[in-house]
Amino acid sequence: MANKSINGDSYQLKDILATELSAYYQIPTYQRPYQWTEENCEKLLDDLLSSYECYKESDYFCGSLVLIAIDTDSKTNAKTYDVVDGQQRLSTFILLAKVLVTLYDKDLNKTSREFLEKSLGDTDEEKRKRLDFNTIGSNAKKDFQNALDFLDDLNASNGKDSTRVKNNYLKNAICLKNYLEKKEIADINDFIKWLYFKIIFIKTTCSNISII
C-alpha cells in the first residue's frame, strides 16, 4: 500500500527555483556539508551544454529532490522545506543562477532575468532568500552568502585561483564562472529558457523524516 505521506512528481527547474512567494528551502542541521567539487561542477556544465546543443527538445533529468514541508506561511501559503536529499545539486543550481545573472547581465531579456533573480530569492520588498541554512555550529550560511556576494564584483573575481579557496561554495562559484567565460553560447536567453523548462527533478515531499 502506498504511503500517503509521501508524494513524488516531476518538476521543471522553474517550478523548483523560480518560485517567488511559493517555495523556500532550508538545509537542516542533520545534513552533511556541501561537498561538490570543481570536477562535479564542470561535469554538470559539460552535460548541460551537450544536452542543450544535441538533444534540445528532450528533458534533462537531474535526479531526485527529497523534501520535508516544515512550515506554511499564513498570508501567502508559501511552504518552507527541509532539504533531505539533493542539496548538492540545489545549491549548485542557485550558484549557477547567480553566475549567469552576473556574467550575462547586459544580454538578458526580462524573462531570463526573472527566472535567475527569483532563483536567488524573492524580488519583493522582503527579499526572502530561496535557500537558507539551519546548521548550528556550521559556517555554511555565511560561506554560501560570501560566494554570492563575491560574484557581484566580476573584476575582483577575475583571475581568482580557486585552489587557494577553502569555502566550497565560493570555489565552485569561481569554477562555474571561469567555465562559462570560456564558452560561447550563441543565444544565452534561449539557453536559460532551456535550463528552466527542460531540466527535470523528481521532487518527493514527506510529512516527516521518519518515513524516508
PLM feature spans:
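Glycine- and hydrophobic-rich flexible loops that cap the catalytic core of alpha/beta enzyme folds
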Residues: 1-212
